[in-house]
Swiss-Prot record:
InterPro entries: AcCoA_carboxyl_beta, Acetyl_CoA_COase_Trfase_b_su, ClpP/crotonase-like_dom_sf, COA_CT_N. Keywords: ATP-binding, Cytoplasm, Fatty acid biosynthesis, Fatty acid metabolism, Lipid biosynthesis, Lipid metabolism, Nucleotide-binding, Transferase. Belongs to the AccD/PCCB family. One of its GO terms (biological process) is fatty acid biosynthetic process. This is Acetyl-coenzyme A carboxylase carboxyl transferase subunit beta. Its EC number is 2.1.3.15. It is an enzyme of class 2 (transferase). Acetyl-CoA carboxylase is a heterohexamer composed of biotin carboxyl carrier protein (AccB), biotin carboxylase (AccC) and two subunits each of ACCase subunit alpha (AccA) and ACCase subunit beta (AccD). Residues 29-298 form the CoA carboxyltransferase N-terminal domain.
Amino acid sequence: MKVETMNWITEVVRPRIKTLFKRETPENLWVKCPETGQMVFHKEVEAHDFVIPGSEHHLRMSAQQRLKMMFDQGTWLDVPLPEAPVDPLKFRDEKRYVDRLKDARAKTGMADAFKVGFGRVGGLPMTLAVQDFGFMGGSLGMAAGEAFVRGAETALDKRTPYVLFAASGGARMQEGILSLMQMPRTTVAVRRLNRARLPYIVVLTNPTTGGVTASYAMLGDVHLAEPGALIGFAGPRVIEQTIREKLPDGFQRAEYLREHGMIDQVVHRRDLKATVARLCGLLMQAPAATPAPASAAAQPVPA
């Protein structure tokens, strides 16, 4: 009898007590800083636009979060994006390409790696295109190429600056030559913006590599980058294995590229909106320069 009572206590009562007082803890309650190992509340990180307080490490953002951060509240409209053929090569590696697309869409809630929005940034009309690294590494395929071109066409139609937030591992291998074809297509779209004298500003985020770096991500009128962003064609490990030499510290990082003239400015995420708005305001004011009268030229410039 005593044994049966003990079994009932251990097998029935104790588990129920544990269940009664168990608190469900969300999996994303804490965020660990990749640099320092510091544990921070997810809500606190989100409130700081996904920058770790203290270390200032910039975490990746989704396209939706990026657009929400940049656009003035209540001014943002999604730009409808054209559909592209799905898996024209019937590609399969360890998994069918159509299944990879299905998984990525379920994970991100996006149709593909690009999201384009039209609205106001700092009061200025602007067209923004954002790559989401969470969708198959932000890879460039036919749908992404179509989205970039549609964003450029929107900027041309509405006479606004075009601002790109790049985040990609490069061309999408599952689409082969059809993916590589997007490199010249997007380059032509940038050329159309240039001929229309509309600013094209690129913000390089972590990481921006491969065919994206070899095309539209390096064709901007102004190139900004977030701190610590990896920017290059091939990754540092591939380069080291190829040349069999140790690369310099910080090689291919935003700060290194800034020091060597590859980009114009490294901008903290909290300052991006104001910086982009200021640049676009300056570049959109492009009246023809007229020589000042001689009398006016002699007057001192007011402080």
